[in-house]
């Protein structure tokens, strides 16, 4: 089933994961964010709004807003599923 996904589309997402690791020094620090579901949803919307407004790159990471939104959705999904198990 994984053959259906062109992994090259995720290159920007992986670059953002590397940026986060360099910035915070902890792998998977996004998993431990308080109120993760709400915060990752808000972050996703911010990046989508910036993209919709014509801003291609995030000023801090220098990566595409659309890639940041995709990564935020992945993080949001993780927190949603974690909270659903409670």
Q: What function would you assign to each model-found segment?
A:
Residues 1-86:
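Intrinsically disordered, low-complexity regulatory regions
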């Amino acid at each position: 089933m994984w053959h259906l996904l062109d992994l090259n589309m995720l290159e920007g997402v992986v670059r953002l994961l590397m940026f986060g690791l360099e910035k915070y020094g902890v792998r998977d620090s996004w998993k431990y964010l308080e109120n993760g579901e709400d915060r990752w949803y808000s972050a996703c919307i911010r990046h989508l709004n910036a993209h919709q407004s014509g801003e291609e790159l995030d000023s801090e990471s220098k990566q595409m807003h659309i890639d940041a939104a995709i990564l935020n959705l992945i993080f949001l999904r993780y927190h949603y599923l974690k909270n659903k198990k409670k």
